[in-house]
Amino acid sequence: MIRKIQWIAMAVAAVLCAACDAHIDVPDTAVRPGHILCEDGTALSYAQYEQSGKRAIAVVFDTERREGTEGNGYAVYLWDIAPASFADSLGVAQGTSADIGALDGNMNTFALYDTRETASPMAEAVFDLWRYGQSAYIPSVAQMRLLYAVRETVNPVIERCGGHPLPLDEYDCWYWTSTEVSGQETAKAWLYSTGSGAMQETPKTQAHKVRPIITMNK
């Protein structure tokens, strides 16, 4: 009887050890910079995207959750918007922020679009991109800084999706932000260089490229 109990105990131990040694693959569902944001709002790795049959619209470049900000991160639109002006006339307060540390591009873009005293050609162009609740907008200086920090990560993915890579050299690398210049809000706003990370204050009636971004929402 004792020997039978010993054999049973040994068999149970062997089963438990085998279970411990078994490897179970758990799918990695974490969204990371370089993942692809699709038109339906899902974010996929490139391998998943290739198998999905979905349409890509942007590449994820930031996934940090920050207090006081909406959404679950940011994705950069695959394509540039043709050069357009911040405003079609000077001397008008458009209600956008001059805080270069604020992640407020979405609010700024709406303020530009909603101003009645002057039009914002770049804001109007960005509003035309809105699809399925994934609302594109003009990034603030702070959001462009986040994009600049990972531009070499997202550029290869943008290219593979048929988009426009962010310029990394000193030529044709300037983009409008939605942040105005403090103390000169009615006349100037900031350009941002994806080649160097530099900023340049610029009259708002000048036409420059825009690279919209999207807030990811679950």
Language model: regions and residue ranges:
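An exposed tryptophan-centered "aromatic clamp" motif
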Residues: 120-135, 141-193
